[in-house]
Curated annotation (Swiss-Prot):
This is 2,3-bisphosphoglycerate-dependent phosphoglycerate mutase. It comes from Clavibacter sepedonicus. Catalyzes the interconversion of 2-phosphoglycerate and 3-phosphoglycerate. The keyword Metal-binding does not apply. Belongs to the phosphoglycerate mutase family. BPG-dependent PGAM subfamily. The gene is gpmA.
Length: 251
């Protein structure tokens, strides 16, 4: 039997807008002090467990890039090769980007709020190109042209993420490399849904905490040997996931 492939998923550390309880999406916000500490702890967990990444795949958003850099430095792996892609970006929250989650919940009610936040195939209203939180003039997306997302549901995230998983991440895993993917709550939910075969309905209940490595051992068909993977700090992961689930109720 072939050796299991090792995939490490890491959601970026807590950001300034996580702390302010704002919809972030593709808005490029910095890590908070808590997020920096989470990145450092993630690196310590990787080093302590002996799970040392050989290659990094990350989004083009600074909160993921910085989290990965902080974690890899703490783990002594700053030198590994890196690939960045918009396909690992957070879900685009459309016109909700920059809006307060608690205010949105109060204004539109729990049913509409839950639909926009957790529905598999219903996106929020699209963002206008002249909105201050639009990415229409962002040079990192210049090659996307008219295909630049202006809103997304989780289904859209899966459709733009999976081609990259198959073309770039799977080959690294197949070569025997330990792969670190540092990304976002929804792009990682999209990947976990694919890996674990989670249904469209059940994925709404999955929450991924910030800054805690989630390790998957995959067989030769890239299927999890342990469904759901294993967090390197299970207690902190459970508390973090509960905090993510409660977003919107927080003032």
């Amino acid at each position: 039997m072939a050796e299991p492939r090792t995939l490490v998923l890491l959601r970026h550390g807590n950001s300034d807008w996580n702390q302010k309880n704002l919809f972030t999406g593709w808005v490029d916000v910095e890590l908070s002090e808590q997020g920096v500490a989470e990145g450092q702890r993630a690196g310590e967990l990787l080093a302590e467990s002996g799970i040392l990444p050989d290659v990094l795949h990350t989004s083009v958003l600074i909160r993921a890039i910085d989290t990965a850099n902080i974690a890899l430095k703490r783990a002594g792996r700053s030198w590994i090769p890196v690939q960045r892609t918009w396909r690992l970006n957070e879900r685009h929250y459309g016109a909700l980007q920059g809006k307060d989650k608690a205010q949105t919940l109060a204004e539109y009610g729990p049913e509409q709020f839950a639909t926009w936040r957790r529905s598999f195939d219903v996106p929020p209203p699209p963002i206008a190109d002249d909105d201050e939180y639009s990415q229409s003039a962002d040079p990192r997306y210049a090659d996307l042209g008219d295909t630049l997302p202006r809103t997304e549901c989780l289904k859209d995230v899966i459709e733009r993420m999976l081609p990259y998983w198959e073309s770039d991440i799977q080959p690294d895993l197949a070569s025997g490399r330990t792969v670190l993917v540092t990304a976002h709550g929804n792009s990682l939910r999209a990947l976990v849904k694919h890996l674990d075969g989670i249904s469209d309905a059940d994925i709404a209940e999955l929450n991924i905490p910030t800054g805690i490595p989630l390790v998957y051992r995959l067989d030769e068909d890239f299927r999890p040997i342990v469904p759901g993977g294993e967090y390197l700090d299970p207690e902190a992961a459970a508390a973090g996931a509960a905090a993510v689930a409660a977003q919107g109720s927080k003032k």
